[in-house]
Design a protein with these regions (language model features):
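Intrinsically disordered, low-complexity, positively biased terminal segments
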Residues: 1-197
């Protein structure tokens, strides 16, 4: 396994960890991790791997889904993008997890959560923000919820893997209102988890 750190005058730009493997047509560089501080770091890392082309037939690289790879490569004829996103995550304490999802000053939202493995996660939770402080309160049983989800969908919303609209395609997810606040609390963003379980 090889590890390389790429820097400029201001400090680290990116790092690359890869392992040589035998492929069908020759040696493949299997990039286990590629992290970059800014777009220039990604360009430098890809350029570095390109310079190793005499030793490797190809490189297999996992990148965040929001990286416009075709726009970065001048000649992307030999790229074969595939979608291999299998992140594993699970909320184990709903109240603490929702604490990180502020609704916006003076706003609140409610989420009904169902968790078949951890009964303490079941219930309707109200998340409020006042004076910069976020509070999460478990409401009495039967309270109305703006959003109803199981813990798996909640986890995907919390890490930004799903947008609110995408979550609505999942079975058992219902939206009753407060759409604008829920959008602010659960924005979609690139999920880039490279740890293997």
């Amino acid at each position: 396994r090889y590890t390389y750190l790429l820097e400029d005058a201001c400090g680290p730009l990116a790092y690359v960890i890869f392992k040589p493997e035998e492929g069908e047509d020759g040696k493949i560089g299997n990039v286990r991790e590629l992290a970059f501080a800014k777009p220039e770091g990604l360009r430098q890392a890809l350029g570095f791997l390109y310079r190793l082309g005499a030793q490797y037939e190809a490189f297999r690289i996992a990148l965040p889904e929001d990286v416009p790879l075709a726009a970065l490569l001048e000649e992307s004829y030999d790229t074969a993008p595939t979608w291999i996103n299998q992140p594993m995550a699970r909320v184990i304490h709903v109240e603490k997890a929702l604490q990180a999802k502020a609704p916006g000053e003076g706003r609140s939202y409610t989420v009904a959560v169902e968790d078949q493995l951890l009964p303490g996660n079941n219930g309707v939770f109200q998340v409020s923000q006042q004076g910069g402080a976020v509070t999460v309160e478990k409401l009495p049983e039967g309270a109305q919820a703006d959003l109803s989800v199981d813990v798996r969908v909640l986890t995907q919303l919390l890490i930004g893997f799903l947008s609110l609209e995408e979550a609505l395609y999942k079975p058992g997810v219902t939206l009753s209102g407060n759409l604008e606040t829920l959008h602010q609390a659960f924005p979609k963003r690139a999920a880039y988890l490279t740890d293997l379980f």
